[in-house]
UniProtKB/Swiss-Prot annotation:
One of its GO terms (molecular function) is melanocyte-stimulating hormone receptor activity. InterPro entries: GPCR_Rhodpsn, GPCR_Rhodpsn_7TM, Melcrt_ACTH_rcpt, MSH_rcpt. Residues 64-72, 141-163, 212-240, 301-317 are cytoplasmic. It comes from Alouatta palliata. This is Melanocyte-stimulating hormone receptor. Belongs to the G-protein coupled receptor 1 family. It is a multi-pass membrane protein. Residues 1-37, 94-118, 184-191, 267-279 are extracellular. Receptor for MSH (alpha, beta and gamma) and ACTH. The activity of this receptor is mediated by G proteins which activate adenylate cyclase. Mediates melanogenesis, the production of eumelanin (black/brown) and phaeomelanin (red/yellow), via regulation of cAMP signaling in melanocytes.
Length: 317
């Protein structure tokens, strides 16, 4: 497969447009109009991927080591870390292969490169879908633990969690294979966009409802102890800020990528859209950043997991 410049990506199935030149500034589109291009150096991209890789490997190792962390909630967190690991790993592999091909250090036939491209595309797409699914699964798990606290352990059992996890992985791999095989069809890209929006709405509805319940609970405690109302208001503000950060990070990191896919369908030849297409690698970098942030939000806030992580690190030395 011929390479088209230093930033040519193997992930061509989801990006039918050229990527950015190695600078930050104004570049011209095909009509000569200026476009703002933001280039992500390969070194920075690989470094972020490596940080994500190490971070998520530690999460998986810590959960696997401690049997106390083998509950459904931590199973979902472990699978989120594993899918994030695959997202960063597949993108790192793709970038490394591109650099080796362009340097002439990896000589192979075009058919082999094409097969490698298809494999990486399926791996990347399926791991992205899994990451989104497990973010939704964690939200559902927390929702059930709050609204059905007394029946939580009978509703969210370990066998059910394992079946849900297996279903997510199988469905993601199968759908990704179909998506990559029929990536030229607009319906495929629209399905991905709709899936992202569905996950965003699901998480927003569940977390907003959980925040409302938490505020009601805090208000009840305030009345019981005859404390002043500002304490409840302060709790509500902190909860709203936490919710805004959680959903904001999710939308900021994933939104641009799916906006790109939507624009590929809606305005592939429009001047403004063509300028946005040039920043495709930036959108992938934001997803890599999300794989770095996810453990900080969902895993490292657990004291039990952090203690196990310290044990893992001490044993490795």
């Amino acid at each position: 497969m011929p390479m088209q410049g230093a930033q040519r990506r193997l992930l061509g199935s989801l990006n039918s447009t050229p990527t950015a030149t190695p600078n930050l500034g104004l570049a011209a589109n095909h009509t000569g109009a200026p476009c703002l291009e933001v280039s992500i150096p390969d070194g920075l991209f690989l470094s972020l991927g490596l940080v994500s890789l190490v971070e998520n490997v530690l999460v998986v190792a810590a959960i696997a080591k401690n049997r106390n962390l083998h509950s459904p909630m931590y199973c979902f967190i472990c699978c989120l870390a594993l899918s994030d690991l695959l997202v960063s790993g597949s993108n790192m592999l793709e970038t490394a292969v591109i650099l080796l091909l362009e340097a002439g250090a990896l000589a192979t036939r075009a058919s082999v490169v094409q097969q490698l491209q298809n494999t990486i595309d399926v791996l990347t797409c399926s791991s992205m879908l899994c990451s989104l699914c497990f973010l939704g699964a964690i939200a559902v798990d927390r929702y059930v633990s709050i609204f059905y606290a007394l029946r939580y352990h009978s509703i969210v059992t370990l066998p059910r969690a394992r079946r849900a996890i297996a279903a997510i992985w199988v469905a993601s791999v199968l759908s990704s294979t179909l998506f990559i095989a029929y990536c030229d069809h607009a319906a495929v890209l629209l399905c991905l966009v709709v899936f992202f929006l569905a996950m965003l709405v699901l998480m927003a509805v569940l977390y907003v409802h959980m925040l409302a319940r938490a505020c009601q609970h805090a208000q009840g405690i305030t009345r019981l102890h005859k404390r002043q109302l500002p304490a409840h208001q302060g709790f509500g503000l902190r909860g709203a800020a936490t919710l805004t950060i959680l959903l904001g990070i999710f939308f900021l990191c994933w939104g641009p990528f799916f906006l790109h896919l939507m624009l590929v369908v809606l305005c592939p030849q429009h001047l403004t859209c063509s300028c946005i297409f040039k920043n495709f690698k930036v959108f992938l970098t934001l997803i890599i950043c999300n794989t770095i942030i996810d453990p900080l939000i969902y895993a490292f806030r657990s004291q039990e997991l952090c203690r196990t992580l310290k044990e893992v690190l001490l044993c490795s030395w």
